[in-house]
């Protein structure tokens, strides 16, 4: 699964129930996309102020499933709840993330993988939120030259497979682009919360 959200801007004077910024209104379409068929498994429509990470509290995690998400969803207590449910996550590390290395696996740097490590979070509160090992993979993209740092709780899959899983997250960006282009939700038939949500759903 890939988890992300997209924001749809609205006029504050017409949609005052959906505050976003001081002069703007917006709704957010929080979506869990099943990557096996590019079909949404979960959609939640909120006002523009709801932080993405709060959506993790609404999901029922499927044991054995992978949940791929960006840095906006990094909350160690919530990721630990996902871990305890028997599911796996793949995300990018926020900077700076304080962690100590416990173990380093051998890597083939010619593949772009710079390091593959087991780490423990530093800090009293962080360590309480996620008290087990995390896997940290540093990958250098040879095309862009960018170095990406991934976090996962899966210790079995090869490092390159974890990197490829994160790359598959872009399917949800294509899904959002398709929605905005084809479902014509730039023009709403009503201004109430129910009218907007009904139109998005239909």
What are the functions of these language-model segments?
Residues 3-16, 21-202:
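Single, function-defining residue in the core of a domain
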């Amino acid at each position: 699964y890939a988890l992300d959200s997209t924001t749809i801007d609205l006029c504050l004077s017409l949609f005052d129930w959906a505050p976003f910024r001081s002069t703007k209104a917006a709704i957010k379409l929080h979506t869990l996309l099943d990557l096996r068929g590019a079909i949404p498994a979960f959609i939640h429509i909120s006002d523009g102020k709801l932080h993405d990470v709060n959506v993790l509290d609404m999901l029922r995690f499927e044991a054995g499933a992978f949940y791929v998400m960006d840095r906006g969803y990094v909350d160690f207590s919530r990721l630990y709840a996902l871990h305890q449910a028997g599911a796996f996550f793949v995300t990018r590390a926020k900077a700076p993330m304080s962690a100590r290395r416990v173990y380093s696996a051998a890597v083939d740097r010619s593949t772009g993988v710079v390091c593959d490590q087991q780490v423990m979070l530093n800090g009293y509160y962080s360590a309480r939120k996620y008290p087990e090992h995390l896997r940290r993979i540093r990958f250098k993209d040879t095309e862009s030259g960018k170095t990406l740092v991934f976090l996962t709780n899966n210790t079995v899959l090869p490092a390159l497979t974890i990197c490829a899983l994160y790359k598959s997250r872009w399917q949800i960006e294509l899904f959002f682009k398709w929605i905005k282009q084809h479902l014509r939700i730039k023009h709403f038939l009503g201004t109430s919360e129910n009218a907007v949500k009904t139109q998005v759903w239909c």
